[in-house]
Amino acid sequence: MNWQTELNNSLNWILTALFWVVLCFSVTMLALKQTTFGKKFWCIVSPSMDKKTSIKLILMLLVLFIMILLEVRFSVLNSFFYNGLYSSMQELNIEKFWFFAKLNALLVVAQVIHAIADYFFQQVFEIRWLESFNATLVKRWLNKKKYYRLKYERDLPDNIDQRIEQDAREFITSTVQIVRGVINSVLTTIEFTIILWSLSGVLTLFGFNIEKGVVFFIYAFIIFATLMSVWIGRPLIKLNFTKEKLNGDYRYSLIRVRDNAESIAFYNGEPKEQTFLQHQFRQIIHNRWSIVLKMLGLNSFNSGVTRVAKLLPLMLQAPRFFSGQIKLGDMHQTVQAFNRLMTALSFFRLFYEQFTLYQARLNRLYGFITKMDELDKQNVHHPFHCSHRVALKNFGIKDEQGHVLLNNLNINLENGDALLIQGASGTGKTSLLKAIAGIYPFETIGIAEHPCMGSLFLPQRPYMPQGTLREAICYPNINPSHAELEQTMKDCALGKYIHALNVKNDWQAILSPGELQRVAFIRILLTKPDVVFLDETTSALDETTENLLYQTIKERLPEMIILSVGHRSTLQQFHNKQLKLDVCLLCEN
């Protein structure tokens, strides 16, 4: 083997290697689909791989393969050029020295350009995949109100926000690193084994002469080191999975304190919160110490192997060098070949800690995806007919276990009717309202009718998304430039905030509970729904403001059907029908 042959064969080598890489990659992916790991992996990635996205990612994957092949090829050429450089120094041949120095300079320029292009294409691939993957995860989470139904699941996946954002992003990055590492390692192993084979001679070990013994000795050394590393680091898989869960739980608890700051302050609950947070943090620290102790053993072993590997090739080739069988350049190329081979064969050993994290993220994403599949397969019985009115025929609701909570309800509401649902706490008022609106997570009985379009459900604490006050009030689909917005704010006693309409802030936290409920009535007046469901939407308001808001919507929207849940007797004057769930009677006022 010589540098001229290797340089001239580079293009042919890249094309041939690309063919085999694509073939082996395809066969490996098909084989992995039959394993537990492969089934989990495919379950995670397949939903985001539509035809258009798949074509783009495959093309970018081919570019990445070419980048990997170029990296390996540059390493091979680099070893031959340095062989020539060091051999020319031993021969005291200055012309040959400068020739190889210039070749190395050109190779350095090519490697710099390659490194820039490689980084760019890898980032493009990861970003494009992440865009598709994230869109799929978010869509599946929001579709069919699964984000809402998950609240009622017994085995709720922990920290869903972390799984969608962090785990998904790091899963993609780690997948690319693993694929790159495996391909690079296999090709490097093949190429530098050939180089090392050509440089090796007879190795005398314990009185035995072994032809090409350097290669066999190095392989035995690296395989032993890899197996030992896997054995030492195996417990890290479970520990890293636990670490992700504990960190997510701790972040969630901190967010809960922030979101419920006012209630905690009124209760003087700081000592209790601090005790709970310290308990969670102690679990994180305990887990971290467990990881540290395992990593001490793994890192100590890896460090020892790495240091032994630095001297090993020189010691193995020293007899041949001092006997004049090989040159100084051959010694240097042997060291390079050994180091590259060592890195390639030790890929899994050196990557083991990251791989344990990868498996943990894979399992967390798989748990999320399978839960989404489970919810998709659930056949929740919600008999519903589209109509211009609201009607219940022998209607009832069941709880999570299938027990009947309410039954045999018959209601008929035409345009302009208003129904007040009252009853003792726990009788199912809000659940009934959700069932009529079509968002009840469990099974219902009988038939419900209401308009398919033009319904608005307003909970006790209206939701305010991030952004300006204008965007928050107009959530989800009111025109932010609505001509009646400012006047409606005045009509609903919220005119003092008109000047802040274009101010970005956390309006959910800034507005008081009563002000948030006024926002709900602004949305009613701007949306003009056919049916509105009010779940104790005036509970934080004084009776005067409550009277003002109900009168306003009744006057402005006389044909609108209203269904209200509330405890106050003052609400009765705004409703012509009443349902008391404690006796299940429909009364005419």
From Swiss-Prot:
It is found in: Cell inner membrane. PROSITE patterns: ABC_TM1F, ABC_TRANSPORTER_1, ABC_TRANSPORTER_2. Pfam families: ABC_membrane_2, ABC_tran. One of its GO terms (molecular function) is ATP binding. One of its GO terms (cellular component) is plasma membrane. Residues 390-587 form the ABC transporter domain. It comes from the Bacteria. Its main location: membrane. Belongs to the ABC transporter superfamily. This is Uncharacterized ABC transporter ATP-binding protein HI_1467.
